[in-house]
């Protein structure tokens, strides 16, 4: 039977991608349905109990700047917060938080259940309704049919998921959850390229059986950071310490002696695993010269005794897992409460997607998260927000939107996926972005919140907070520009006392702030330059904008040059065999990737500058040279 109501957008899956997609579509005013196999696992942290990190924290800030959920949920659930790379430049500083799994899940569910325009329904999805190459609905396991104008697939590792522990394996979406077999088979019938990937998780350890007295604690930062631009530390629950231990030669010997029982090394697992989050057996073999690896013992929550040993993801048999754990300092008597495992699952080639994450072949069908070949909560959530937003726009007959590479890490992420695809689980790093100085955590709201407001994602409270911050920054910078001191000014001795070289000519506040020995806090304690802004976000922004102004201006010039290529569009139906002068290799790659623009074409491996020049000349001769707005 058909459900009596029609929806604008259906989201299939309630993980990090699905929950952000559902919230985005509903915030835009679209009638949204979130279909999940289990309402109790909405927002579940399936692997490590942490949010953020290098590159990943940047994505979380961008999600927040666009009105998303992840940062606010982390502020309500975070039990340890740290700023990584704190001693380095602002471009690579990143926030990371340990999170209480239960509190995080509760925060996500509360937000979903209180979001207008959003209905949640518990049923696995087994089929899509596709008519004339356009998706128009979904069918659940009990045969109930839902109609919608757009559908977003955020099914994580559930598509034909297979769990491996040693040489044994069984079907599963993750530990304790069934796989999605019928939906996987249905999707394989569509004109989409599909392959297999693998990821894994470590065994969980009972904290009561760990001798923490032997281990070094790792504490959070003071003052405690926050994730959301609207957050404050008073929202955080009680804070906890992590602890550090190490593998050793005994650990490595156990692993080497049992490689024949590893499903990965025995050839049972076909999917490719994540390069930047390898299993412990992979680390031991790939880095044979290392006699130890650092392992972080991360608490799973305030009310849980489970410890997540970050760094020993494994699919070795349970008896070997016990030997590995008990070979490490402090864990000699440890008990495992959940075994580690690897999971193989289907993913679909993201080169078959537009930058909006809509399928090139099935209208109204959007993909987000691990189904696109990514790994990580943050990457999934960012894609979910974008897919939900664009599904909402599609349902309203509006053009899709996607940020450029110079506008957001989200732009880098979707451009990498839709242009280059991936053969291994893709994770975000700051090194993937060409314009890191522009894409900092601290300015994510300055880059994206205004656009989020135009798109209908940003509510009045966030907009008022953002507008006030912008006003504070502009007024404070003007105030500093208007305050001048010269070598003979009254109180100049106090200023010279903190300068490496005394004033030799007149200078204003911004010129003093550009000096490496002066920061904003110090400047505003000097005569005439106080008082300081009370909003730490606005104060940080003033300092960064002033100190890096020259570098930022140069990077902006580079961006403007690149945009000329980025905005030169390529016809979607162009057969590159028509373009004389291109090599057979270039023709094959362009016909395979079908890039949207000259800029996108230039990032495809093997596409040379000479090939780009030939393309530009051909487009001009054919009268096809046009640029997007």
UniProtKB/Swiss-Prot annotation:
It comes from the Bacteria. Its cofactor is FAD. The keyword Protease does not apply. One of its GO terms (molecular function) is flavin adenine dinucleotide binding. GO terms for cellular component: cytosol. It is found in: Cytoplasm. FAD binds at residues 13-18, 125, 180, 370. NAD(+) binds at residues 273-287. The keyword Secreted does not apply. GO terms for biological process: tRNA methylation; tRNA wobble uridine modification. Homodimer. Heterotetramer of two MnmE and two MnmG subunits. This is tRNA uridine 5-carboxymethylaminomethyl modification enzyme MnmG.
């Amino acid at each position: 039977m058909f459900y009596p109501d029609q929806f604008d957008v259906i989201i299939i899956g309630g993980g990090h991608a699905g929950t952000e997609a559902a919230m985005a579509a509903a915030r835009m005013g679209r009638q949204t349905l979130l279909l999940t196999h289990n309402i109790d696992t909405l927002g579940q942290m399936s692997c490590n109990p942490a949010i953020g990190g290098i590159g990943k924290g940047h994505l979380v800030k961008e999600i927040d700047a666009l009105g998303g959920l992840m940062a606010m949920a982390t502020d309500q659930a975070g039990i340890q917060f740290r700023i990584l790379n704190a001693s380095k430049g602002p471009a690579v500083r990143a926030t990371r938080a340990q999170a209480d799994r239960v509190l995080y899940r509760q925060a996500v569910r509360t937000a979903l259940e209180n979001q207008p325009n959003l209905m949640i329904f518990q049923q696995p999805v087994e089929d899509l309704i596709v008519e004339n190459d356009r998706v128009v609905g979904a069918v659940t396991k009990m045969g109930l049919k839902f109609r919608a104008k757009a559908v977003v697939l955020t099914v994580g590792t559930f598509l034909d998921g297979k769990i491996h522990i040693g040489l044994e394996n069984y079907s599963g979406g993750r530990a304790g959850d069934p796989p999605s077999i019928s939906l996987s088979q249905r999707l394989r019938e569509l004109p989409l390229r599909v392959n297999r990937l693998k990821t894994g998780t470590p065994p969980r350890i009972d904290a009561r059986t760990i001798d923490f007295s032997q281990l070094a604690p790792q504490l959070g930062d003071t003052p405690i950071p926050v994730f959301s631009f609207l957050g404050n530390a008073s929202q955080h629950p009680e804070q906890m310490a992590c602890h550090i231990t190490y593998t050793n030669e005994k650990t490595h010997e156990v692993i080497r002696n049992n490689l024949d029982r590893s499903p990965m090394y025995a050839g049972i697992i076909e999917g490719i695993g994540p390069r930047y989050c390898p299993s412990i057996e992979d680390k031991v073999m790939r880095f044979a010269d290392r006699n130890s690896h650092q392992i972080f013992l991360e608490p799973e929550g305030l009310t849980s005794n489970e410890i997540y040993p970050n760094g020993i993801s494994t699919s070795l048999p349970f008896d070997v897992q016990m030997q590995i754990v008990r070979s490490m300092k402090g864990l000699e008597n440890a008990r495992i409460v959940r075994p580690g495992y690897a999971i193989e699952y289907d993913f679909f080639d993201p080169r078959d997607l537009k930058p909006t994450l809509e399928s090139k072949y099935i209208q109204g069908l959007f993909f987000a998260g691990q189904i696109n070949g990514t790994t990580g909560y943050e990457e999934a959530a960012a894609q979910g927000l974008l897919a939900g937003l664009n599904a909402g726009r599609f349902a309203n007959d509006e053009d899709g939107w996607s940020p450029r590479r110079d506008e957001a890490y989200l732009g880098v992420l979707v451009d990498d996926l839709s242009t280059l695809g991936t053969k291994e689980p893709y994770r975000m790093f700051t090194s993937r972005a060409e314009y890191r100085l522009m894409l900092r955590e601290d300015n994510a709201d300055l880059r994206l919140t205004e656009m989020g407001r135009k798109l209908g994602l940003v509510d009045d409270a966030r907009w008022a907070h953002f507008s006030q911050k912008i006003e504070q920054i502009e007024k404070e910078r003007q105030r500093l520009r208007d305050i001048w001191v010269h070598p003979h000014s009254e109180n100049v001795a106090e200023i010279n006392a903190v300068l490496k070289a005394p004033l030799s000519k007149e200078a204003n506040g911004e010129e003093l702030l550009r000096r490496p020995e002066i920061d904003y806090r110090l400047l505003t304690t000097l005569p005439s330059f106080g008082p300081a802004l009370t909003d730490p976000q606005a104060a940080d922004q003033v300092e960064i904008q002033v100190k890096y102004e020259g570098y930022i201006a140069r990077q902006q010039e580079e961006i403007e040059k690149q945009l000329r290529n980025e905005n030169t569009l390529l016809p979607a139906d162009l057969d590159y065999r028509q373009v004389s002068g291109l090599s057979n290799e270039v023709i094959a790659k362009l016909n395979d990737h079908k890039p949207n623009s000259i800029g996108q074409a230039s990032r495809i491996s093997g596409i040379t500058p000479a090939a780009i020049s030939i393309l530009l000349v051909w487009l001009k001769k054919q009268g096809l040279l046009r640029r997007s707005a």
